[in-house]
Amino acid sequence: MRIAVVGAGALGTMHAWHAVARGHEVVHLEREPQARGASVRNFGFVQVGCRAEGEELAAARRGRELWEEIGAAVPGVGFRPCGSLVPVRTDAELAVAKALVGRHDAADRGFALLDADEARTRNPALRGALRAALFAERDAVVEPRRAVRAVQEHLAGSGRYTFLGGREVVEAAGGTLRDDRGERHHADAAVLCTGAWLGGLVRDLAPDLPVRRVRLQMMQTEPLGEDFGTAVADTDTFRFYPGYAGPWTDALNAEQPQHPTAASWGMQTLIVQRADGGLTIGDTHAYDEPFDFDLDEAPYAHLTEVAEALLGRPLPPVRRRWAGVYAQGLDPRPVVQRRRVDDRTWLVTGPGGRGMSCSPSIGETTLDEMGL
């Protein structure tokens, strides 16, 4: 069968991956020359430990398995099974970590509580003060600015994949797409993975779509000059992800309120090392549109302060700063908004911040539901 996929970010590319793997022919359209949205502006952090119990955790675990398989087939993805650490310093933070490793599903999440020496064995670059750390062994990273393009180049070698950049799809019906150059692309089925683009065609097809947009700010440093052995999060991550929530996080919030800057910007601090040695650090979360177009310095100052406290040393110079926008379902329980808009056309959007982690499993499930 011939499958049309719209959107060249991680979500669209993973749908194309599974379609080609199942023997189908794929035409892949992207309105930009190449992906420029959230997939290439994020951490490349494949997170399992923080996911909500049930469907989301299962999707993240399967997504991580698939990323490892894809990384083995496509080295340019840069898959690294490095795990992640959340260093803790206070009694309230330690209580959260202990509660999490005592969960009934802690093994599924790969959780372990490490003492300070064990944590620094995993990541010797952590020279700041810490008492212990929550380790999530199943977490991994990929290279976000390279991964989707590397997968697309690999798919092109199959002889059953065609990428068409600079083509905005303006009409979709019955498996046929019309782009803004007036060309029609006929397929047996079409999957629209348009990311944070929720107007135009998407609004026409699904005007009541329960999805919002979220804006973030991030930065990347020059090379650190040493191996940063794991991904790292500060303890604001306990406040942010539903998979960590419980009486223990309520106690943390009561005993140790979040820093005012972090609270006002919806922040946690995540740090992931890139293949060139630089550190990707973020992020903020803004939910009310219209979004500012400025990059504000207050959250960057907070990120720098937290990162330097974890490292116990100054950060390397900042190489670049940027903002990104992703689509998130208003109801956090479904992993993604998946809607059949006609007999041959499906719309898949709104995975939120779990898009990079879960895209491979989301694509797999979509094709299963389509009977492909």
What are these model-predicted stretches?
Residues 2-27:
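N-terminal Rossmann-like FAD-binding beta1-loop-alpha1 element of flavoenzymes
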Residues 43-122:
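Dinucleotide-binding Rossmann-like beta1-alpha1 core, especially the glycine-rich loop
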Residues 76-88, 113, 120-158, 284-288, ...:
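Helix-loop-beta segment of a Rossmann-like dinucleotide-binding subdomain
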